[in-house]
Amino acid sequence: GIPCGESCVWIPCISAALGCSCKNKVCYRN
């Protein structure tokens, strides 16, 4: 539930390496 400061509209979350996932076109962690 914490925004990672990254969007994932066109590309995947680069911050996925930090445990972030795409939700509602924004990368979140927990």
Curated annotation (Swiss-Prot):
Protein name, per record: Circulin-A
PROSITE patterns with a match to the protein in the record: CYCLOTIDE, CYCLOTIDE_BRACELET
Function per UniProt: Probably participates in a plant defense mechanism. Has antibiotic activity. Inhibits the cytopathic effects and replication of the human immunodeficiency virus. Active against the Gram-positive S.aureus with a minimum inhibition concentration of approximately 0.2 microM. Relatively ineffective against Gram-negative bacteria such as E.coli and P.aeruginosa.
Cyclopeptide (Gly-Asn) cross-link, chain position(s): 1-30
Post-translational events: This is a cyclic peptide.
Domain description: The presence of a 'disulfide through disulfide knot' structurally defines this protein as a knottin.
Family: Belongs to the cyclotide family. Bracelet subfamily.
Cystines in this chain: 4-20, 8-22, 13-27
Alphabetized UniProt keyword annotations: Antibiotic, Antimicrobial, Disulfide bond, Knottin, Plant defense
InterPro entries: Cyclotide, Cyclotide_bracelet_CS, Cyclotide_sf
GO biological process: defense response to bacterium
Record organism: Chassalia parviflora
One Pfam family hit: Cyclotide
Domain of life: Eukaryota
